[in-house]
Amino acid sequence: YNKAHTMLQAYALITQNVRWSSCVQLENGRQVSQLVMRSASGPNAIQTNMSALFGTKASAAVQPLDLDISLDEPARLQGVISKPTMGLGRSSGDRQYFYLNGRPWDCTKLAHICNQVYRTFNATQYPTVIANLIIGPDKYDVNVSPDKRTLYVHDETALLERIRELLEDTFSPSRGVFAVDEPKKLS
């Protein structure tokens, strides 16, 4: 059940203008709603969908991600990633969703890069990542596994290295920056 629920969440995060509803039939015959939402549309759809699924607190802990990773042809990485501030990440990498042109994608290499770069800024946590890699349809092959979630990307190594560089650039302004609480008067 958990695997199916996670898969539905992955689709609900990336789709636009779709009504999602799923429930679980308990042994006593009672139904419990697990996922009820209408996916948003527009430029902030991923963050809005994230807020609907995981709550506004989770949505407030992320920043937009829009990286131009073009090498020979146009390519972008769009979505959201946790702000590299202590306390805004997660204790595990359970909220990392990757897509290739809107198709859910099991990409452990991209997850590893996101985790590695993020942990240079926040060493104790993992980022929430919802990232859609947008490349030309002739730059990847979906016929790798029956579930179509394992994809072969042409020039994958160069694209991933470019993503690493741009993620480091994105986070670098926050290097060495710490959140400070309001000063309190000692009595």
Predicted regions and their residues:
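Glycine/threonine-rich ATP-lid/beta-loop region of ATP-binding domains
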Residues: 1-97, 101-105
